[in-house]
């Protein structure tokens, strides 16, 4: 049976900074990891990749049934060359329909044994193991989580032990000897046993762990590889965001979008009976996380409405209900990470943006004044006649951009910006690792308004020392627009396309030590 199918081996090579020139994605109601949008004359086209191909193996690793983010990560880690084993779309669908073992295609028996168990989850001697960090959400039952914490002589960190059979921890996916990386979004790799126990106690009746299993932890220590929290598996979480796709009806989509009061962000309200919104599964009080694949977590009400309208006669929303939102906030993860794990363009094999949760439910009350004071700030600026009224500065050779020379009474001053504030996000996009010029361009391209997440120098140093991700949810929410209580109907007779004005005139100068642009 397998001899009737002919997979192709495609070897792609690119230059540093170049893209492979294709998209790797998954699609609704379509099986497999699909190759899409193969660019003309790109490394992908030259290697023989075609639109609709399904990726079976990456560098010999069988990936057909693995999570999309893991497949993306394998390509990303391949550097400037990667070998893909692919099957054309028609053959793939026939193979699936006739239940052909896709692992056997294009592989000798010897090759099959090399690396099929690299990706997670796999069964190893009856025990499930993983090769990436994973989030586990525990809700206490009968006053117990069903686990204990231990330290191991000669090893740094705290580990899971005494897992109660069929207890809360086991059902949540916790394994014996798991290395505990985070408690409620806070890194605890350098914390003592007593400190970790105290954090878990303070968490109350629910807690979120970021864990890695024993074997994976051992490999990372031996290879001196640091875990990236944004690669964490969300598979074990009991509540997940929902992707809602709608086509506009004669009376619009049939819902109101309202700025939340208790809940930060934009909330779905007053869904019309029988409307496209109701039929697509949208629910009252859903929080909008993304519109047509773009995060809207830090955008204001009018901007989100405009993004929906720009979608024309159809739109795709990533939404969460209150329970799911609270769970993700506890982990300091954005629900947008779920969208990225489902479908991520990978022609450029780009890094996933740093998580930017919409809001944060504090898992334990701060017990010191120091913790209360350490907050980032969300600042919304409206451009004046002379720009935004601040200079953007960066130290050559060092990451990060920061605020200088805030003009008294200017837009930046009125929005709460201060000298030495470090810029974390521009319009919801994390820019900490972006070059100075790109940060400048993002601000200038924002038109007449820009939303910045910034952090004072002392607070920034504190978060860095504690390994706490700086996210918008830690900041106080922006003021709710005065008309938000009335709601805005997203419907067909409002389809204006507001062109964003790009600022062309900026005063700038540079020296041997810094680069400085007036906004």
Swiss-Prot record:
Lineage top rank: taxon: Eukaryota
- Spell out the Basic and acidic residues composition-biased ranges: 482-504
GO cellular component term, pick one:
apical plasma membrane
Q: Where is the composition biased (Polar residues)?
A: 357-367
How does it associate, per the subunit comment?
Interacts with PDZK1IP1 and ABCC2. Interacts (via PDZ domains 1 and 3) with SCARB1 (C-terminal domain). Forms a heterodimeric complex with NHERF1. Interacts with AKAP2, BCR, CFTR, SLC22A12, SLC22A4, SLC22A5, NHERF2 and SLC17A1. Component of a complex, composed of PDZK1, SYNGAP1, KLHL17 and NMDA receptors. Interacts (via PDZ1 domain) directly with KLHL17; the interaction is important for integrity of actin cytoskeleton structures in neurons. Interacts (via the first PDZ domain) with PTGIR (via non-isoprenylated C-terminus).
Known function: A scaffold protein that connects plasma membrane proteins and regulatory components, regulating their surface expression in epithelial cells apical domains. May be involved in the coordination of a diverse range of regulatory processes for ion transport and second messenger cascades. In complex with NHERF1, may cluster proteins that are functionally dependent in a mutual fashion and modulate the trafficking and the activity of the associated membrane proteins. May play a role in the cellular mechanisms associated with multidrug resistance through its interaction with ABCC2 and PDZK1IP1.
- UniProt protein name: Na(+)/H(+) exchange regulatory cofactor NHE-RF3
Q: Which species does the entry assign this protein to?
A: Homo sapiens
């Amino acid at each position: 049976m397998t001899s009737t199918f002919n997979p192709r081996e495609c070897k792609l090579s690119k230059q540093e900074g170049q893209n492979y020139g294709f998209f790797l994605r998954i699609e609704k109601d379509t099986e497999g990891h699909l190759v899409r949008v193969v660019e003309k004359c790109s490394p992908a086209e030259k290697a023989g990749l075609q639109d609709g191909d399904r990726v079976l193996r990456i560098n010999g690793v069988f990936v057909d049934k693995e999570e999309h983010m893991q497949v993306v990560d394998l390509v990303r880690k391949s550097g400037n060359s990667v070998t893909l084993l692919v099957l054309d779309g028609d053959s793939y669908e026939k193979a699936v329909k006739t239940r052909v073992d896709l692992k056997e295609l294009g592989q000798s028996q010897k090759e099959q044994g090399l690396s099929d168990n690299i990706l997670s989850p796999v069964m190893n001697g009856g025990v499930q193991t993983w090769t990436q960090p994973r989030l586990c959400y525990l809700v206490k039952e009968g006053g117990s989580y069903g686990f204990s914490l231990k330290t191991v002589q000669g090893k740094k960190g705290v580990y899971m032990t005494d897992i109660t059979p069929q207890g809360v921890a086991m059902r949540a996916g916790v394994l014996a000897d798991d290395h505990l990386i985070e408690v409620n979004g806070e890194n605890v790799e350098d914390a003592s046993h007593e400190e970790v126990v105290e954090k878990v106690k303070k968490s109350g009746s629910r807690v979120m762990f970021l864990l890695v299993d024993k074997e994976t932890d051992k490999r990372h220590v031996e290879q001196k590889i640091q875990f990236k929290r944004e690669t964490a598996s969300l598979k074990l979480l009991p509540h997940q965001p929902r992707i809602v796709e709608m086509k506009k009806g004669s009376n619009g989509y049939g819902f109101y979008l309202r700025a939340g009061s208790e809940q930060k962000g934009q909330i779905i309200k007053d869904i019309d009976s029988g409307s496209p919104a109701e039929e697509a599964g949208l629910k009252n009080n859903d929080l909008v996380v993304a519109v047509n694949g773009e995060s809207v977590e830090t955008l204001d009400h009018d901007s989100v409405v405009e993004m929906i309208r720009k979608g024309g006669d159809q739109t795709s929303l990533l939404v969460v209900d209150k329970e799911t939102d609270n769970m993700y906030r506890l982990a300091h993860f954005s629900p947008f990470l779920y969208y990225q794990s489902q479908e991520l363009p990978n022609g450029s094999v780009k890094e996933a943006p740093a998580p930017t949760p919409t809001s944060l439910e504090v898992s334990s009350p701060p017990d010191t004044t120091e913790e209360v004071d350490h907050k980032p700030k969300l600042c919304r600026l409206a451009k004046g006649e002379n720009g935004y009224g601040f200079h953007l500065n960066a130290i050559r050779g060092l990451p990060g951009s920061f605020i200088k020379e805030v003009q008294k009474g200017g837009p930046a001053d009125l929005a709460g910006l201060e000298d030495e504030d470090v810029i974390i996000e521009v319009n919801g996009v994390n820019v900490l690792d972006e070059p100075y010029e790109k940060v400048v361009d993002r601000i200038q391209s924002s038109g007449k308004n820009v939303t910045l997440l910034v952090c004072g120098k002392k607070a920034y140093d504190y978060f860095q020392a504690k390994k706490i991700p700086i996210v918008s949810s830690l900041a106080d929410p922006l003021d709710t627009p005065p008309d938000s209580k009335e709601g805005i109907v997203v419907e067909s007779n409002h389809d204006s396309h507001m062109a964003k004005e790009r600022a062309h005139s900026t005063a700038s100068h540079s020296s041997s030590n810094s680069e400085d642009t007036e906004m």
